[in-house]
Amino acid sequence: MSMLKRNYVVETIRRAVMLELLAAGKRPDGRGLDQQRELKIETGVIQKANGSALVTLGDTKVLAGVKIATGTPFPDTPDKGLLVVNAEILPLSSPYAEPGPPSEEAIELARVVDRGIRESEMVDLTKLCLVEGKSVVTIFVDCNIMNVDGNLLDATSYAVVSALRTSKMKKYKVEGEKAVATDEEVPVPVATTPVSVTMARIGDAMLVDPNSEEEATMDVRVTITTDDEGHVCASQKGEAGT
């Protein structure tokens, strides 16, 4: 039997077993269809960062670190600071992760998480403006995926949100057209707390927080981000393997 045919047979059997379980309202790890895995959040885990958080969602583990600097605003938003989210799936996090430049999955992950943070207006970027058109505060959030067991979108979002909520930045004073950092530290201006929830459809069943085994057989994945008031800020649809 060729490797291609063998893989097809294995995947067909795996999906059939999954559909049978879901039809009985069960999941491979014993959870209910609407039950999330255990979530643990530790903040302040990186001493040199302005803020950080380590999130464990089941066996998925994500570390987010915040670094804050000053920079030049974009020409179309001269009165707003900058927020940049990056993600890297470490080679040791999964048998399928490879060393080298960020993968398409890592790029999509950063983009979707960034959108949820940005569209919810979690950080008041206008309060990061120091000298309009010339100097603003720039917030960099770097995410390292340390272990992959499904639902990277939610785990990474929780890590970024937790890191930002506990971040401190220098207070600046403006002298003429120059911003000077003081010794005083202030919190990052957080206005709301976005919450990301990811669901997967496998056959006719919808389930919350899919793990890797479930993602391997899912037909569609949907991620929805809401703010403190329950308003939908962002959504993302993807199929298995995306």
Regions found by a protein language model. Give the residues of each.
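Polyanion-binding surfaces on beta-sheet-dominated domains and ring/shell assemblies
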Residues: 1-242
